[in-house]
Amino acid sequence: IGRRSAVVVDDGHLVAGLQQRKVLDLFGGTGAISFEFASRGASRVYCVEMAPAHASFIRSQARDFGLDNVTVVHHNVFDFLEICTEKFDLIFADPPYAIDGLAGIPDKIFSHDLLHPGCYFILEHPGDFDFSSHPHFVKERCYGNVHFSFFSADEEA
């Protein structure tokens, strides 16, 4: 797990809240974040990854680590968000910074009602994105050029 992402996972509020929670990890990459959530007590982690080799690797690693609470979804994240009918207690997204559509990810999450009330969506992004005017924006944490924007499902966020 990368140091910057570990800082977010280590946030005391989020770690305590992971016990028996359902988590969605978008743009799974190597699966490190999914494995961290799973090892910290999440009851189910859905890891969405489009690249076949990455999805296969994550699936294999989860099996090797004995993490039967990790489900790998081999799918394009944007298409997945359109068809997903589940609700989650935490959603984390670490998209490639150059990906088209990064700015619209929060709107997709909230327009499809994917979070339980009071739960968080965390988006990792470069500093040239500013989500502070989004109606569900809560706070931003910065580590050098890496930014994490936190959004809440509550209307009063």
List where the protein language model places each region:
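Class I S-adenosyl-L-methionine-dependent methyltransferase catalytic core
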Residues: 1-157
